[in-house]
C-alpha cells in the first residue's frame, strides 16, 4: 500500500516543520506529502525541509479553510496516483500539530491491505491537548510516544479494531477509492468543525471506517491558528444542523452534540473557566439560534462574524 499525506496548515509553520520530521522517521515513509497553507507565513521555512528539497513533499497556497485546503491537497495528489489501483494506495490527513508514532503509516497500510472492507482509519490518541489551556508540549509528546508517560483517558482508546460512524480529523486515513471519489464539504468554512464526521460518514458507503489501536499518536492541541470563540460557537450549532439536513449526521447525534456543547459553554462561562473563550462560544451559540429561528442559519455565515 502506497502512503500519501495531506497537511492543511494555518499559522503553524513551526509545528508543520516538526510534523515533517516525524514523517521522515516513519517506518513506511510516505510516497509524497502535500502541504497546503493559505498565505506565505503559514509555510514559512518549510521550503528548506529535506522532504521538500528532495521532492518528496511540495507546498501549495490556497484560500483559507480546512475543507478547502484539504481538497486542494487531494486534487494535487491526482497526478501522483494516476495509474495506480485505487485500492492499493491511501491518503492520511494529519493536523499540523499531530505527532504520529513511527509505525502509524505502516500500521494503517497493513490494516487496509489485510482488510479490503476497511476504507477509513483513525488512530489511538495517547494525549489530546485540544481541551486544555496550553495543550501538550513537544517534549511530552515524545514521552507519551516512548511510553515514558502513561496515556491519558481518551475515547479513541481500544484493545482491538472498533467500527465507528466518524473518524477524528487530526489523524485519519482513507483508501484511494474514497479519496478519489469524495471531497470535503466547503460549506463548512474556516476550522471546518465536524468536517471529519461528514467526510467519514459519506465514506461509509464504500466500506467500514474504524479505530485502529496500532496507529498511535499525540494531538498537541496548539491554540494558534484556531477560529475565534464567537465563530466557533456559531459553528457548534450551524454545522451539526447543516449535516443533519444533508443526511450525513443523524438528528439525534446533532442534538446531542449541540446540547452538550451549549451546556458546557454555559457552565464554563458561569464558573469563569478561561482555558478557552467560552463566553465567545456561548455568544456564537446564541447568534446561531437566532439565525435558526429566522430561517437564516448557514455555516457560511461564520465568515461574516
Roles of regions detected by a PLM:
Residues 231-239, 250-305:
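Non-catalytic, C-terminal membrane-associated alpha-helical segments of glycosyltransferases
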Residues 94-99:
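The conserved acidic donor/metal-binding loop of glycosyltransferases
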Residues 103-140:
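Conserved donor NDP-sugar-binding/catalytic core segment of glycosyltransferases
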Residues 7, 11-25:
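Short, well-formed alpha-helical segments that are part of the catalytic scaffolds
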Residues 166-182, 189-215:
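A short, conserved alpha-helix in the catalytic core of glycosyltransferases
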Residues 208, 212-230, 240-243:
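Active-site donor/metal-binding and catalytic loop motifs
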Residues 141-164:
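Short, flexible, basic/aromatic active-site loop/helix in glycosyltransferases
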Residues 20-60, 78-82, 87-89:
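Acidic donor-binding segment of Leloir-type glycosyltransferases
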